[in-house]
Amino acid sequence: MQILPIFFPLLITSLHAIPRGRRAVRNRNEGDINSLVGVGQYLYQGDIAVVKSRARRAVIRQKHKKWKLPMPYSFDRNFPSRSRQRVLEAMQFWSEKTCVTFHENRYVYPHVSIFEGNGCWSFVGKQPSLREQSLSLERSCTDHTFVVAHEIAHTLGFYHEHARGDRDQFISIDYSNVNPNLTFAFAKESEKQLDHQEAAYEYGSVMHYSVDQFAVNTNRPVIYARDQKFAQAMGNRMRATFQDVSRMNVLYNCHERCANTLNRCQQGGYPAPSDCSQCVCPDGFGGNFCETIEAHSVGQKDNSDCGGVLWASETSQTFYGAVRTRVHSNSVLPTPEHCFWHIRASQGKSIEIQIKNIISPCSMSCSFNALELKLSNFTMTGPRFCCDEHIYNRYSQPKVFQSEGPLAVIGAYARYDYLDFNIEYRAV
């Protein structure tokens, strides 16, 4: 298996020369894993392999760098069966939500060769000069289905969300807290090179790095959201978001498949390219036309505290919710358990919410569990929290959140142990 050299300023090396280093801490994202195994400094933006000639965009624009579908791929003969299952799960996610399909065939060229290399990395889009295009997934990478989905998205043509040329309107980078060997991982693309499909900035994108990515002092953020409500929404890989899916559908012209289908989908949803009779719905919505609540994950079927519809009145009410994993060891779930709630009020009203407490494994980036509030544009990721410090102001009072209309959506995700919370809400 050949792996071409990668080039960027002050660094010309070969991936063959990358030291294995110490094993990655489990259950982090691809950037952390690559940094810990010693390969991050050899990869553009921390997990991207590049050839000498490249064009950098949020998504690729050149037609010759998009894959003819189904995208052919092969597994290295020594690729672990457990890791293979994670790859197939990630591929299934993209196939169910888009028109992108995959076909295992090592005898077609070019194709993607998936192997257990050093770290988690991929090229961006099809590389016409390569017969076998490498996609490296060491075992730590496959602890999390959506770390794999992130790398597959690179292979299909996605760059990082935080590399957008307009990113300074939405985030700032504290370079004083970035590992000096990895400052280039936060390279920003120029507007002339950028193709972000005129999409809104998605803090929760599966292509966004986390708030503490490559930090020297892990008690301080590296990435600061201009809107601090979204500080913990960045990079926790709970799922590829509705916006990620929509951009993939635009990139591969998937909407053409349902061009003659009446769009009856609500809340910004649209006919699913894989089955035009179904809808691709924003996170938190389900049913035939996105008219109802998204179903809970299979593991929550016996959890009476998971999900439901609540009606707000002008009198404050409280409710308790929980999502549980039954995982209490050093391992975590590859895909989080999830529950959703809709809080509704009468027309002309909005909903005021205070989160009284959260009981959950706490981390700066909420990489294990998270509670999400969607208060306005339901097609975008909302603020996420996993610690009491995230929900209290400097006066030790619960922060007050208010929806823009008569609907608020609450999502709870857990990959480890459980997440319990108490909320007070009312119509205003």
Swiss-Prot record:
Intracellular or extracellular location(s): Secreted
Domain (Peptidase M12A) ranges: 58-255
Disulfide bonds: 99-254, 120-141, 258-276, 281-290, 306-339, 366-386
Residues holding Zn(2+): 150, 154, 160
Active site residues of this protein: 151
Name of the gene encoding the protein in the UniProt record: nas-27
Reported function: Metalloprotease.
GO CC annotation terms, alphabetical: extracellular region
Glycan-modified residues: 181, 377
SUPFAM superfamilies listed in its UniProt record: Metalloproteases ('zincins'), catalytic domain, Spermadhesin, CUB domain
Needed co-factor(s): Zn(2+)
Gene3D superfamilies in the record: Collagenase (Catalytic Domain), Spermadhesin, CUB domain
InterPro entries according to UniProt: Astacin-like_dom, CUB_dom, EGF-like_dom, MetalloPept_cat_dom_sf, Metallopeptidase_nem, Peptidase_M12A, Peptidase_Metallo, Sperma_CUB_dom_sf
Entry's cofactor comment: Binds 1 zinc ion per subunit.
Enzyme Commission number: 3.4.24.-
Record domain EGF-like: where: 250-291
Record key words, sorted: Cleavage on pair of basic residues, Disulfide bond, EGF-like domain, Glycoprotein, Hydrolase, Metal-binding, Metalloprotease, Protease, Secreted, Signal, Zinc, Zymogen
Coiled coil ranges: none
GO annotation, biological process: molting cycle, collagen and cuticulin-based cuticle; proteolysis
Protein name in the entry: Zinc metalloproteinase nas-27
Signal peptide range in chain numbering: 1-17
Propeptide positions: 18-57
Enzyme class: hydrolase
GO MF entries: metalloendopeptidase activity; zinc ion binding
Domain CUB: 306-428
Pfam families: Astacin (PF01400)
Highest taxon listed in the record's lineage: Eukaryota
